[in-house]
Amino acid sequence: MQKQRFCLDTTAITDSDVRKSLGVSNISESAEKIMDIIAQARVQLDISCHIPYNTVYKELIGFLVREECAPETLIKVNTWLVKKTPNRYEIKIPAEIFYEYIKDLRERINKGMRISENAMYETALEAYILSKPDEKDREDVLNEVLSKTVNSFRDKYRNTLRGGTLDSAPDLDVLLLAKELDAAVVANDEGIEKWAQRLGLRFVNARDFPFIIQEYLDLWDKK
């Protein structure tokens, strides 16, 4: 059997769907459960789980510290997750992938610009309506209209520009390291999943990952 390797994104440990699937209420519990499963799989089956260093590793540790996870959990992370920096100078990515990414990014920028223009028109129209005589003073109009429009604009802009694409160095490092190691990507991120598929990488949804590893372990115990 081919050695199994997995490359973990932060969401493999911290995502809310993972907690629900494990039946736990907080990140500390889910992180400890996942790390125990990973440790058992490493010792019994030589299954290795990798994390890009220091981008994703730093992001994950920061998250766990903010959530006040036990020091023992952090020790398990440092012990059982193999930290490695992707060899960014040697990994070969087809030029077509870069072409698709730039094309996708350009389309998102254009959509974001249209959302910005629409937000300005909506602000001007609502300000005009609310500023009619004997209704509200200028300051109230600005506060009401701008707060409403800015909140709506922020959500639409974020979804358009960031949803379903790679928007950070840690996201890219997960894919690069997985490609270098021929490992399966573990994440709950639409952008990572989309580009993992385009790179021909195996992808495992974060909420399924602990159960996949546990299935390997259960089968081994039956031998």
From Swiss-Prot:
Q: What top-level class of enzyme does the UniProt entry assign?
A: hydrolase
Q: Which reaction does it catalyse?
A: Endonucleolytic cleavage of RNA, removing 5'-extranucleotides from tRNA precursor
Q: What Pfam families does the record tag this protein with?
A: PIN_5
Residues spanning the signal sequence: none
GO biological-process terms attached to the record: tRNA 5'-leader removal
The record's GO molecular-function terms, alphabetically, read:
ribonuclease P activity
- Family (UniProt): Belongs to the HARP family.
User: Mind telling me which NCBIfam families this protein's record contains?
Assistant: PRK04358.1-1, PRK04358.1-4, RNA_lig_partner
Record's protein name:
RNA-free ribonuclease P
Give the source species: Methanococcus maripaludis (strain C5 / ATCC BAA-1333)
